[in-house]
Amino acid sequence: MPVQRKRRIKLCPLCADGVREVDYKDVNRLRRFTSDRGKILPRRVTGVCAFHQRSLSRAIKRAREMALLPYVMQ
């Protein structure tokens, strides 16, 4: 008889914090959603919802253009 496991409900960390729109100037928050090489992490890794993933990618790209975040980290 197979063992039944309860699935954990994933909750978006940004929804849990009550964040509506991600700010490109909040570099510490943006770094949590980039890899050690500076790439934007996918939703399945970070656990954010689709709305916040789009907002995060826009904010990270803006922060890169403003030189707040590097394009590539060594």
Curated annotation (Swiss-Prot):
InterPro entries: Ribosomal_bS18, Ribosomal_bS18_CS, Ribosomal_bS18_sf. The keyword RNA-binding applies. GO terms for molecular function: small ribosomal subunit rRNA binding; structural constituent of ribosome. This is Small ribosomal subunit protein bS18. Signal peptide: none annotated. The keyword Phosphoprotein does not apply. GO terms for biological process: translation. Keywords: Ribonucleoprotein, Ribosomal protein, RNA-binding, rRNA-binding. GO terms for cellular component: cytosolic small ribosomal subunit. Binds as a heterodimer with protein bS6 to the central domain of the 16S rRNA, where it helps stabilize the platform of the 30S subunit. Belongs to the bacterial ribosomal protein bS18 family. Part of the 30S ribosomal subunit. Forms a tight heterodimer with protein bS6.
